Amino acid sequence: MLKWVQSGLSAVAGTAEPEYGPDAIQPITKRIFDTNNGKIYRATEPKDFEWLSPNYTNVETQTFYFTDLSNGNIGFAQIIHSNVMGLTTTAQFTFRLYNVKDKSINLWTSTKLEDFEIKDSNFYAKDLSLELKDNKVYKLKSSVNKESIVEFEMERLTDGVIFGDDGMSFYGEDPEQPWGSMRHVFWPRCKVNGTITTADNKVIEINNGLTMFVMALQGMKPHHAAKSWNFMNFQSANHSAVQMEFTTPKSYGTTKVNIGIVTDNEKILIASIDNQVVHSDTKFDDVGGWDVPQKIEFNYIDGKDKDKQVASVSGNLSQLVERVDVMAEIPQFVKNIVSGVAGARPYIYQYANEFTIDINNGDGEKVKEDGVGFTEVTFISD
């Protein structure tokens, strides 16, 4: 999320948008009923993971959120491909490692990529490769940063998920000619094996770990697309859950868009829209200037009965991995424009905690299981 927001804010070239109203966004949660025969989701195909690389301002990412339940290591590996105003294309590899049992393990690297190239679903750069094999396995090799040499193999365990037919939310008063877009495509539960080599040549092994893979596109400036985000990746011995929610600024009617997935080891149990994220015990953060939750709950809502909750993932946000000041690396003159004109003061709060999933399948069977959740609560503007 950090580089995604940073890239767009760095390209800010003017003012806050006028208030177009909620009709100026066509979220995937509404477009579903006009595409894919009204089905909430479909299984992904290899073409869904091809890099789109549009020739206008956008940030496109492929991210693997990994969890090793045996030793508490969690984190993510992310490739970022961004285009600023159709003029400059850059790429970055970011990596996070954190241990929920040992807070001294907290590694973050962000490295600019050189000589990068896109080939369909694959991505190559100097000292880095990411390749999709047989629509089943991703192989990642990166030695671009000696503090985080990564070699992962991720194997999909369930169907992939794309909401609607194309996963797209569009911004603009004319649906046929949108001026912005948002897209997410998922592999919600995968196994991961591999190694992480740190600067002191310590090798951290991941054996039969779990990962959630998401490919995302944000085709407009981030502070215009959303004023806040809630994101959760949960992994336990037998279940995975992901939920992603963004709320638009007033210019698009403060519209909430929420999609979520729950799986077991073999299949998709729930793919739902219009879910609910609940912040509890909020506390004002003097550093970021936001009311930040101390507890959080991600509720999954039945597609046919909006009053029926079919699952939830919840827990305390007691372990703050990092409070990310998105503006920290942005030039001062851009900060002044963004905060003064656009009203943005973006902070990302990253957490890693023990969470609990509760599932009610509607047949009287209820499942409850503890696991580990990685959460991002992002505030961009009021």
UniProtKB/Swiss-Prot annotation:
Keywords: Cytoplasm, Endoplasmic reticulum, Golgi apparatus, Lipid transport, Membrane, Nucleus, Transport. It comes from the Eukaryota. SUPFAM superfamilies: AttH-like. It is a peripheral membrane protein. Ceramide-binding protein that may transfer ceramides from the endoplasmic reticulum membrane to the cis-Golgi network membrane, and is thereby required for the biosynthesis of complex sphingolipids. Belongs to the SVF1 family. PANTHER family: CERAMIDE-BINDING PROTEIN SVF1-RELATED (PTHR47107:SF1), SVF1-LIKE PROTEIN YDR222W-RELATED (PTHR47107). It comes from Candida albicans (strain SC5314 / ATCC MYA-2876). InterPro entries: Ceramide-binding_SVF1, Svf1-like_C, Svf1-like_N. Its main location: Golgi. GO terms for biological process: ER to Golgi ceramide transport; response to oxidative stress. This is Ceramide-binding protein SVF1. Residues 1-18 are annotated as: Peripherally associates with membranes. Pfam families: Svf1, Svf1_C.
